[in-house]
Amino acid sequence: MESTMSSASTNASPPSASEKHTPMMQQYLRIKAEHPETLLFYRMGDFYEVFFEDAEKASRLLGITLTQRGSSNGNPIKMAGVPFHAVDQYLSKLVKLGESIALCEQIGDPATSKGPVERKVLRVITPGTLSDSDLLPEKSEQPLLALYSTTQRKTITIGLAWLSMASGALKLMEFTTDARNAATRLKHELERIAPAEVLLPGSIDGPDSDYAFAKNTTVPDWHFDIAHGSKALHEQLKVSTLTGFGAEHLNAAIGAAGALLRYAQATQGKGLQHVRALTVETENEFIGLDAATRRNLELTETIRGQDNNSATLFSLLDHCRTAMGSRLLRHWLHHARRDQAVARARHAAINALMRTDACTGLASTLASVPDVERIATRIALQSARPRDLAGMRGGLQQLPSLRAYVSMCNQDADAPLLKTIHDALATPSECLDLVERAIALEPAAMVRDGGVIARGFDAELDELRGLSENAGQFLVDLETRERTRTGINNLRVEYNKVHGFYIEVTHGQTDKVPDDYRRRQTLKNAERYITPELKAFEDKALSAQERALAREKYLYDQVLQQMAQHIGTLQNIAHALAQLDTLVALAEHALRHNWCAPQLIAEPTIAIEQGRHPVVENHIERFIANDCLLNNESRLLLITGPNMGGKSTYMRQVALITLLAYVGSFVPATSATIGPIDRIFTRIGAADDLAGGRSTFMVEMTESAAILNGATENSLVLMDEVGRGTSTFDGLALAWAIARHLIDSTRSFTLFATHYFELTQLPEVHPSAANVHLSAVEHKDSIVFLHAVQAGPASQSYGLQVAQLAGVPQAVIRAARKHLATLEANSMQATPQFDLFADPDHLIPTSDVETAMAQPSALDEALADINPDALSPRDALDALYRLKELSNQHREK
């Protein structure tokens, strides 16, 4: 029996004199020293134990009991533990908290071990190296990324390598920049890739804010050696050159890949058989979307952050039946390709799917398909469980039906993408035959429980199972014979796990027991015996059961190894299934909501007829559709109108329709014609960055600067209320200058919403700008928003009416109306502010001052205080007499 007890005092960390510890604690401390930065889960029988500082940390994070056992240097050895069969739920919680865990397993036999059972860390679990379905989010990836940079003179080359352990997708990217732009450029790529864990050279001092959102892990600088990285890639991909991947000259990225592969292999404790291909991404491959744009357009998260109950573009479109399809849809939304041919191929496939009734059959069949992609990865890593293989079997059995449906859709249709998918869904007969013969129809959850290998697959296993399963009949026969032989009618032959097989006789009948009965256990009312015959059968039956489990484990491992030979085929099938599922989901949505196929052209234009916001239209009864036209003659639309009139919704819908067109989806419009787009920028909303020490206006200007420095003539820019975070004249001057820069210098397609009515004069001096407004109708003191975009500027903002709708007290509204009248009367007076944008002081006419300073009379105030809708007949009569009295007093003055 192993013990944590220490016969001599020790420290809580490895001491210089290890002999002061028990042999087991010496083993623990040695293994812990090899994994100092991880929580070491140390297997002891049916529990994983943690000790010392790890125990304190685990107790705090997991809410498990912290106890103590033995002592070290006069201090108790702190410990905590979790049951091995429930460890996944604890691992999941720790990983979500950004922790890494080393699983130290018993690999020796406790029955034959002299001293501590041999143990070894078989796997290290980190946020970026997960493959278990219980630890991963179903609909998103959690990639591991390595970053390496080199500097030559003033040029910085940044290499990125990232791996999705759960899918086996390995990607590289490299770009050059200068010191001033390096941080911004890197941040943009990290926001796009969204790694769960970032590997950094140890020479980097502390976490950089650009990648602090992920778990940062430092590894020795020499892990990033370029020569080693090149060799590692050649060995992993089984190639003699990287030229075919376009990666031969990406030295910084190759160095990052070397560190990445070394780390990933170390955490898994084995090779990465499922990493079989390499993709090189380039700077200009995707439509650029920074974090602000992804957030403002609410692609996969709402503006308020992660909220599973709120509507996003992803949640709207995710009709996918498989987790693979959902992950691919999410990827498409964040990685819209600039290449119009890619989107056109998807448009053609969706159109073909919509032309037949096959969508319903495809959807129902896909619903029976498991996560083939992640199961294939676990097969390659030899960590797949029996029910994974049963799921794979069920998924592969659906391939003929899916191919038939795809063929039906592709008849008389020009959809090459569907043809590619059809060909990839060919059934791997050898692989399917193996799993159908080998795995039971309803296997146990774990191999150790038995009942995993199907009957008839292995003769030796069937024989061993027969010995174990026939035990019941043998015991019945033995019980009958012994009752006859002894004359004891209530004699019973039974079995339990503690004492094995036995014959039970009540105390009143023990005098009839034959001489060959040997007492095994005494109970209060009975005696339990064993006979030579029963003992011989026990040895044979129990041995058969143990040997059957061992044989089953051996056979299962053999099946996994044979299945691993088909990983490449299974990965191709998984990718085809994901594409098909995503296209079917988009086709279903387009059919249900009357979306149209967009036209992608080479000329610069965004021409949308009767466009609608895809998410908003799904949540209101009637949505007002609007047009949008941007081209060489009209580069900027200046949008005015009331608060809540729909300006932001209109701007977002134009951006979403544009993005969806390049994603390859149909779009919510009557028609949409869109030219080349390289980036989409948004400057929407107002929020400060308290943690970063930035005010609302600083955030606004930082985002505006990123747009002005990064936008091109092929960019779509959304600017909402620029300049509102500072004084009126400062804000107006900045808004005017920014709008002019976007027209004159960048020539981006721009939607510019503002409440500065002075900006509506911009089209008079810039013909490529045009005024549009969101219309509204005022009725008495209320307002009705029409949400229709019309030509020309708005007449007013209706701010007080909106405040009234929001429930601002009537007294405040009345006071605001009075002050508004004063401000409007004083609108020609120059504001005494002094800054870079202020005009010289102007003389203020005395008459204007007198007008502005005039105070309303008591009669005016009394009249303004009256709310006719709130007066009873008697109150109205009293008010009328009061007004009459004030009027007479005013005339007397």
From Swiss-Prot:
Q: Which family does it belong to?
A: Belongs to the DNA mismatch repair MutS family.
Gene Ontology terms, MF aspect: ATP binding; ATP-dependent DNA damage sensor activity; damaged DNA binding; mismatched DNA binding
The name of this protein is DNA mismatch repair protein MutS
Disordered as annotated region, ranges: 1-22
GO biological process assignments:
mismatch repair
HAMAP family linked to this entry: MutS (MF_00096)
Enumerate composition-biased segments (Low complexity): 1-17
Gene3D superfamilies linked to this entry = 1.10.1420.10, 6.10.140.430, DNA repair protein MutS, domain I, MutS, connector domain, P-loop containing nucleotide triphosphate hydrolases
What are the transmembrane regions? none
- Encoding gene, per UniProt annotation: mutS
GO-annotated cellular components: cytosol
| Residues that bind ATP | G641, P642, N643, M644, G645, G646, K647, S648
- Matching InterPro entries: DNA_mismatch_repair_MutS, DNA_mismatch_repair_MutS-lik_N, DNA_mismatch_repair_MutS/MSH, DNA_mismatch_repair_MutS_C, DNA_mismatch_repair_MutS_clamp, DNA_mismatch_repair_MutS_core, DNA_mismatch_repair_MutS_N, DNA_mismatch_repair_MutS_sf
Task: Please give the Pfam families that the UniProt record associates with this protein.
Answer: MutS_I, MutS_II, MutS_III, MutS_IV, MutS_V
Describe the function of this protein: This protein is involved in the repair of mismatches in DNA. It is possible that it carries out the mismatch recognition step. This protein has a weak ATPase activity.
Q: Which keywords does this Swiss-Prot/TrEMBL entry list? A: ATP-binding, DNA damage, DNA repair, DNA-binding, Nucleotide-binding
